[in-house]
Regions:
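Transmembrane signal-anchor hairpin modules in multi-pass inner-membrane enzymes, especially those
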Residues: 1-108, 114-121, 131-157, 207-225, ...
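Membrane-interfacial helix-loop-helix modules of multi-pass inner-membrane proteins that assemble, modify
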Residues: 55, 110-112, 159-199, 209, ...
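TM-adjacent membrane-interface loops and short helices in multi-pass inner/ER membrane proteins
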Residues: 173, 190, 382-436, 442-445, ...
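Hydrophobic transmembrane alpha-helices and their immediate junctions
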Residues: 256, 451-491
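Canonical positions in the second alpha-helix
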Residues: 641-642, 675-676, 710-711
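Short coil turns that delineate tetratricopeptide repeat
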Residues: 647-648, 681, 716
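Canonical tetratricopeptide repeat
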Residues: 655, 689, 724-725
Length: 743
């Protein structure tokens, strides 16, 4: 063994590498750095919600995805280059690798996808999520002590989004003049995303109100914040979000030893929210669809007055509660008694529910069986958009899931391609409603990526779960370890991740960028931190590290020597471990620099790839504009450019065919339509457009009948499929023909 390795300074040198240092400018205090980072995170999450909304608008969503790719790459590059982050052990690497494999598999599915253009878009979305996940892990390495900033940012952004959603009720004339639904859905245009955002906000603000550290005035803001989020959640009528919030709260109160403080904040804020929600549910102007603007405005203004009163009262109560808890803290005996009372209340809830079920017709068995049948019945009707929806058990998810399993049967092992569910589902749907997602991560993944994709998802989930358990200290042997502020914060972030996970399991919130990045950021930070026992040991011994060694270990990327090396401590010719670490750290980090450059290059390539469908849409719009101006040759040229930018989509080919038809070049138009069919043969619309051209323009009823037959097979529930087939049949002299079951 060398003298360096055997030096008695080796443990100290290891601590020097592991001792965390906040990423802050010398002129900024830690509190100011936390405030700035909190504001930046809140702005990022809120901007994601308002710009990308529900993730269904291609251009706006793509811009958000590119932004996350860039931010994530820069954070990863900084973590690879800066010594204070590079010297740490790479915690959470297996989970990150599994996530990367899932993203790569999503992109590879384009090869066999039945809807390759949608698979391209979904691969870009997944790479953006991977960038957000990896970037958050890098930030946790760069600024390990700034974990409160993430919780602050989550809470603040959720309050902003929830507040905006509620304001659309308060001022419908200015913010939601054309709204027809009573349920809150702004800014996502999807009510369950509003509910999930509010649920995440409740958990993050629960930590803020229950924590022992921090400024009491800031902690008091948790009271009105939680109440506002709860009002938004309830007015969205989102049952899935309520379920997710319940799971998150049960986990938080079961794990975090701040139950009394948390219960006081949660119950107090919920009492204020319950009063407002109860009044709102009784108002026709707030709970009925398709009402005149005047009726909605009158009720909305009254709601605004009540909300303002609620916020003021809860702010005062929060300040008073914080002052009393600081001046007269509860004794250990009082906390123990209160904890038992809370436990008794929790136990009492299922008892009361069981009594109510037993008293209902059919008893417990009958009621449970009835609820289960409604929940799993594919033919169940959609519950009305009223407050009664919150207690209804029927759902159309069973229908979407059954259709997803039918799609999965087309290609069980590798799937039909990422995002192909929306296209292939038309073949199996039982109604005329168009649905893009299966409303559940598991059925959606089975349909799109098959058993292989689900296996990769479960692998990533399992590796993340194990790392999270170790980081929070949930193993039995770690329960007795101290609950410092960071451990409470990590448990709260884990609860946020659970809320998102439960919601995405029963809904399509995985595809909503703001919802996804909130949950992924919380999940990533947790596993980027060391296991609890190791972190506590390093924190306890970090003060023993000499300041000179800490400054060297966390010095700049590359600089000349600034002092003479220390004397030999292990015999003639040997050097100290600190000196060896210092000398090695001063050499330019070629390998990390290459890795950082590679990460940035991959992010740039992914961003450029994600932007191509948007560029294709722009070119297609320009082609139509040239056509309207009479510049037919230019329109054809630009339409071909659109196809070159997105060769996997049939839409540029449809535009090209339209322009060629206007030019009178029918053969070229037919060739473009046939190429669209070859590009996406599982899409009924490609066959339908080809058949319409063959029947109406080329007067080829026999060819049109064959095309319409394929369209009917792929989308039999579409009224256009039936009418087109019958029209082509009559043109072929077969007026009594019946649409076939197979092409």
């Amino acid at each position: 063994m060398s003298s360096v390795a055997g030096s008695p300074e080796a443990p100290t040198a290891r601590l020097a590498r592991l001792a965390p240092r906040p990423l802050a400018a010398p002129s900024l205090s830690r509190g100011h750095t936390n405030a700035l980072l909190s504001a930046a995170i809140a702005i990022l999450f809120a901007a994601t919600a308002f710009v990308a909304d529900g993730g269904l608008r291609l251009e706006r969503t793509t811009y958000v995805e590119i932004a996350y790719m860039g931010i994530g790459a820069l954070l990863c590059a900084a973590a690879l280059l800066l010594p204070r982050a590079r010297s740490q052990r790479f915690h959470g690497a297996p989970a990150l690798l599994a996530f990367a494999l899932l993203a790569a598999y999503t992109a590879i599915s384009i090869v066999w996808s039945l809807a390759p253009s949608d698979s391209w878009i979904e691969s870009s979305r997944t790479f953006a999520y991977l960038s957000a996940f990896a970037g958050t892990m890098a930030l946790a390495r760069l600024a390990p002590r700034q974990w409160p900033a993430l919780l602050h940012g989550l809470g603040l952004s959720c309050v902003v989004v929830s507040g905006w959603a509620v304001l659309t009720k308060v001022f419908p004339g200015a913010l939601a003049e054309d709204e027809t639904y009573a349920r809150l859905r702004a800014p996502f245009d999807y009510w369950n995303s509003v509910g999930l955002t509010a649920a995440i906000g409740v958990v993050a603000l629960l930590w803020l109100g229950a924590r022992r550290s921090g400024r009491p005035a800031v902690s008091a803001l948790a009271w009105p914040g939680i109440a506002l989020c709860e009002v938004a959640l309830m007015l969205s009528y989102s049952r899935g979000s309520l379920l997710a919030l319940g799971v998150g709260l049960v986990f938080w109160f079961a794990v975090v030893p701040l139950r009394l403080r948390g219960a006081i904040v949660l119950l107090g804020a919920s009492a204020g929210a319950a009063a407002v929600v109860g009044w709102a549910f009784a108002m026709t102007g707030l709970t009925t669809d398709e009402l005149p603007l005047e009726v909605r405005a009158d009720a909305g203004h009254e709601l605004g007055a009540l909300l303002l009163l609620m916020l003021v009262v809860l702010s005062v109560i929060g300040l008073a509660a914080g002052f009393l808890s600081a001046e007269r803290p509860a004794s250990p005996h009082a906390r123990k008694v209160a904890g038992r009372m809370l436990l008794g209340l929790v136990v009492l809830i299922p008892v009361i529910a069981a009594i109510a079920l037993a008293a209902a017709p059919g008893g417990i068995d009958g009621q449970v069986s009835k609820a289960w049948d409604r929940l799993t019945d594919p033919g169940a009707s959609t519950p009305a958009n009223t407050p009664d929806r919150l207690t209804a058990t029927s759902s159309v998810r069973a229908r979407y899931w059954e259709e997803a399993f039918d799609v999965h049967g087309v290609s069980p092992w590798v799937g039909t391609g990422a995002g192909a569910y929306a296209t292939v589902r038309d073949r199996f749907r039982t109604g005329t409603l168009f649905v893009r997602h299966a409303h559940g991560y598991v059925p959606q993944t089975l349909a799109d990526l098959g058993w292989a994709g689900l296996a990769l998802s479960l692998l990533a989930l399992g590796l993340w779960g194990w790392a999270a358990i170790r980081a929070v200290g949930l193993r039995p042997r770690e329960r007795g370890l101290p609950w410092d502020a960071e451990r409470v914060g990590m448990a709260s972030l884990l609860a946020v991740a659970l809320v998102f996970g439960v919601s995405s399991a029963v809904d399509w919130t995985w595809f909503v960028p703001a919802n996804a990045v909130m949950g992924l950021a919380a999940a990533a930070w947790v596993i980027a931190r060391p296991p609890l026992r190791r972190r506590l040991q390093d924190a306890a011994l970090a003060n023993a590290v000499p300041e000179l060694q800490r400054s060297r270990a966390h010095g700049p990327l590359w600089a000349p020597r600034t002092s003479e090396p220390a004397a030999d401590v292990a015999g003639p010719g040997a050097i100290s471990v600190a000196e060896a670490e210092w000398r090695r750290g001063r050499r330019f980090p070629w390998l990390p620099a290459f890795a950082a450059l590679l990460v940035c290059a991959l992010a740039l390539a992914a961003a450029w790839s994600a932007f191509q469908p948007v560029r294709a849409v722009h070119a297609g719009d320009a082609a139509i504009e040239r056509l309207e101006l009479g510049a037919l040759d230019a329109a054809v040229s630009i339409a071909e450019i659109a196809h070159d930018r997105n060769p996997l989509s049939p839409e540029p080919l449809w535009e090209l065919a339209f322009v060629e038809e206007r030019r009178g070049r029918l053969a070229n138009a037919q060739e473009a339509l046939e190429e669209a069919v070859r590009t996406q043969p599982a899409d009924a619309e490609t066959w339908r457009r080809l058949g319409r051209f063959q029947l109406s323009t080329l007067n080829q009823p026999a060819d049109a009948l064959a095309s319409f037959r394929a369209a009917y097979y792929l989308d039999p529930r579409n009224p256009a499929s039936t009418s087109d087939f019958l029209e082509a049949s009559r043109a072929n002299g077969q007026p009594g023909a019946v649409p076939p079951a197979t092409p």
